[in-house]
């Protein structure tokens, strides 16, 4: 047999080079485009998990304990906001506040803007904090440093949204996980995971399939409905492929 190098110039341990022919699971271009004709990935949007920058204050195994300490955090913030009203600015706020609670850039900016906070018990919700570890998280924009795209994936009346996730960084090898609860930013490590949900939601709360029409068409063309399956004595027709299947 004639030996030829693979597409990467390897003569030994030849590799399969069809990876780039696979359908992308998600891309920045598909995420950003407003045109359906330019979508070229399985999922429309994706997001990192909720980044609180104060897990010790807004995450807990007990919902009651969570609300107690979050209420204390809010009360202390409001006391500082009242004390420093018309005094704090972006340049001096870090030197003026008392550090008996966890201050972050967002919370300092809210204080400078004269904003006061109020506890909302509906913000306490179940979340997947680490693989196979669920906690209660206070999911509120003011007390979470970054939501990324989570407002479109987990609006406040949506407790579960099936997702798959993956991560590949400096601290651990390629890892995948599936779940349905609100995910934490550091679910695997400080290398953030990307979460791809089954659904997304518009500003009015309407549920939209997060799997693109383009991807559905690719699968329908490849796995044609009615094609006889193999691998069993009795052949059965394949079921039509839909986004719900």
Language-model features, listed with the residues they occupy:
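Sequence-level detector for compositionally biased, low-complexity segments
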Residues: 1-245
């Amino acid at each position: 047999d004639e030996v030829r190098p693979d597409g990467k110039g390897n003569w030994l341990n030849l590799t399969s080079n069809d990876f780039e022919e696979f359908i992308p699971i998600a891309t920045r271009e598909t995420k950003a485009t407003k045109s359906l004709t330019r979508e070229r990935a399985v999922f429309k949007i994706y997001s990192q998990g909720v980044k609180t920058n104060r897990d010790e204050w807004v995450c807990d195994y007990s919902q009651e304990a969570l609300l107690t300490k979050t209420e204390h955090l809010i009360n202390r913030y409001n006391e500082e906001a009242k004390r420093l009203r018309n005094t704090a600015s972006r340049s001096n706020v870090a030197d003026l506040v008392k550090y008996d609670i966890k201050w972050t850039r967002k919370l300092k900016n809210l204080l400078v803007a004269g904003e006061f906070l109020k506890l909302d018990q509906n913000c306490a919700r179940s979340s997947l904090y680490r693989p196979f570890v669920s906690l209660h998280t206070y999911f509120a924009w003011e007390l979470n440093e970054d939501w990324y795209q989570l407002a479109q994936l987990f609006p406040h009346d949506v407790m579960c949204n099936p997702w798959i996730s993956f991560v590949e960084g400096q601290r651990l090898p390629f890892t995948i996980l599936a779940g349905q609860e609100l995910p934490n930013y550091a679910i695997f490590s400080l290398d953030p995971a990307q979460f791809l949900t089954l659904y997304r939601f518009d500003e009015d709360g309407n549920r939209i399939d997060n799997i693109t029409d383009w991807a559905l068409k690719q699968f329908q063309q490849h796995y044609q409905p009615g094609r006889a399956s193999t691998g069993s004595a009795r052949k059965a027709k394949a079921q039509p492929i839909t986004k719900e299947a």
